[in-house]
């Protein structure tokens, strides 16, 4: 079947615009060519407890180093923000899904990490976890 040039170009352009994805299970997809996984957690402290949230996040990161590097990075609210940002955020980059899964298993097996989680739950009003695939440029 021979397609007119204009129709062919429309089909090619439409195909290029559709992102490809790989299914990972449980409805999760990762773009083909993803170059890593990023996990972010946001902690919105109860009033007056932002410093304690930061202390416990530091403790959890120290535990992470003892059970399975990396520790990730900790971020704090910047004074010039609009007020919607979390008081404390943590982020860690993993090479792939298997590396993140191994990290999750190490955290789950650590009594020290669970202790930090239990303590943290008493300090925040809201918690969010986000997981992203890093798309190549």
Please describe what each predicted stretch is.
Residues 51, 96-106:
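Short amphipathic alpha-helices within nucleic acid-binding modules
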Residues 93:
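Sensory beta-strand/linker motifs that couple input domains to effectors
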Residues 2-3, 7-38, 71-89, 112-137:
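Glycine-rich beta-strand-turn "strand-cap" elements at beta-sheet edges
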Residues 41, 53, 90, 100:
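Hydrophobic pocket/interface hotspot
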């Amino acid at each position: 079947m021979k397609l007119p040039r204009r129709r062919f170009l429309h089909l090619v352009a439409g195909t290029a615009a559709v992102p490809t994805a790989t299914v990972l299970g449980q409805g999760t997809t990762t773009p083909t060519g993803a170059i890593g996984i990023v996990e972010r957690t946001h902690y919105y402290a109860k009033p007056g407890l932002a410093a304690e949230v930061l202390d416990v996040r530091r403790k959890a990161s120290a535990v992470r180093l003892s059970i399975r590097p990396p520790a990730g990075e900790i971020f704090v609210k910047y004074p010039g923000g609009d007020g919607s940002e979390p008081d404390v955020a943590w982020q860690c980059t993993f090479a792939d899904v298997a590396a993140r899964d191994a990290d999750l298993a190490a955290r789950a097996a650590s009594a020290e990490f669970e202790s930090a989680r239990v303590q943290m739950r008493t300090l925040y009003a809201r918690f969010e976890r986000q997981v992203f695939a890093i798309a190549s440029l």
